[in-house]
Structures are given as structure tokens and as C-alpha cells.
């Protein structure tokens, strides 16, 4: 299976770590032997149609800052678009940074992959948040697969749980803590009685929050995941503009104390229950959703099974890379079934 990897940051590098560490296990257990023929980052690309030496490329990236610095296989300034159009591969992995303003370059990368007959695995929430219905229709039109497990819950199989474990049931509502950064901040404020500003600084120091935390604290990151859940699980044709969003930036210690007096906690909850919303809400302390720290939790309310909750870490390079591996194996199984049918 030939793979093009677009984006070689923390997630992309974690994925090549997994490929190297579990090469024999993946081959023995799943018959999966990926051949990465191209990797791109902001400096350019590394290309070898016979398959790149991943350890070599990792060393070049660490030493020079870009895979394009490889003296044999490097190509300075080569763009993802050029690579997707010119290099033959079965799968394109889109792991560039999330852009919720235009969705680029992710949207163009994904569309180009579809139009050249490539299946797509993405961890980039931007294209899905802005154009989910369009992308799924385009994938179907081109008879290729689109997978995105890592966009919701990182390594926690939230999408798979709803799609497979609750298959045959009717999911009526979804409610969840979908952003670990805001959950950590609210936990710190509640348990240690520190201000929002101090909790945010601690989160940044520990690497839980970005230097510019707007996506997290204003609820935008959670909203992108609401869009993905709504489309994929509940077949709602929504995009980011359809979500009512309120972040946690105005939450005070007094607000949290008032909730505590009632035996409740305030959490940033993303919901799809007729409407699509993200907002701080009071929930009972014994509610399964009431998790602390950087944990995510999602409750699915279905017709037959009732309320089912899945909990796990929502972010991290290796966790998200493990979700990419799940998606790659899923595509491999689909292709094998197609050949046998």
C-alpha cells in the first residue's frame, strides 16, 4: 500500500514512529506493509517511489528542520498539491494544521486526492468542519474512501464506537466534553480555586494549550467536532456556521462555586440534540460525562441502548497517529473485501 503523507509535524512524525516500531507486528497480524512514497512539510518534500527510508527521513527532519533537506530524495519548495497530483499512491494522509477560516490547504489537498483516485485519511478538522457534506459526496462520486477517526477523540475510538458498537440502533442525541484543554482549565479552577488566567497559563506551560488558545477557549475546536459527529453519526448536513458557540473565557470562580454548592460541575459541552451547540453547562457530579483534567467523554443517547458513554484522552501525537493506523487498516479491509466480492 503506497502512501503520501502531507504534513510532518507531531502527528506525522508519530505515525512514522508507529510504522517503524510495529512493522513486523502489522505485517504478521494484518498483512499491512505500508510504503511511504512521499512526505511533505513546510520546507518541501522527500520523494522515493520505491518507498522512503523512514528512519533516514526522521533524522533529516530532526537535524535540518525539513524533509526537503535530504540530499538524495529532498525537493525544496515542492507543495502538497504537486505531490498528490504527480505521485502514484493508493492513500493520501492529510495531517496539516487545522484552519477553520478557509480550510486550506486541507480542502484542496483532499479534493485533489479524490480527483486522482486516492483514498484519504485526515486528522485535519478544518476541511470537515467547513465542507463535510461536499467532501463525502465527492468521495462517493470518485469511488474512494474518506476516514477521519483522529479528528474526534484523538486515539479514543469515539466515532467507531458510535458507528459500529451502536450499529442498528438510532442515536437521538450526542453530548460530550470534546476539548481537553478547556476541561483541564475548568478542573484547575474548580479544584484549586485559581483564576481562569492562571489556569490557562498552567495549561500552556504543560503543553495542553497553544500559545494562541483561541480555538480551544472560545469553543471553536469543540464545535468542529460537533460538526463531524453530527454529519457522520446522525447524518445531519451541517457545517461550522450551523453551530451555536459559547466558550469558557467568561467563566469566573463565582460561577463555578455556585455550581458546586448545588452538587454540580461546569463543563464545556458540545451537543447535537435537534440543535448543534457548544456552551458551558452545569452537569451532575455523578454524571459519566463529569471527567476531569484533559480527558474527553462523549455520551450517546440511543433508542434501544439508552445512554452509553466513552471516555479517553482526546489529544496527543501518538494517540492521534494510532487513529490514523486504525483508519489505514479499515481502508485495507474494505479494499480486500471489494477484491473478494
Predicted regions and their residues:
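Conserved active-site and cofactor/substrate-binding residues in soluble primary-metabolism enzymes
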Residues: 6, 10, 14, 34, ...
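A short hydrophobic/small-residue beta-strand
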Residues: 120-121
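N-terminal glycine-/serine-/threonine-rich beta1-alpha1-beta2 phosphate-ribose binding loop
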Residues: 1-112
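Conserved anion/nucleotide-ligand pocket segment
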Residues: 164-224, 229
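Substrate-binding/catalytic subdomain of NAD(P)-dependent oxidoreductase enzymes
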Residues: 200-297
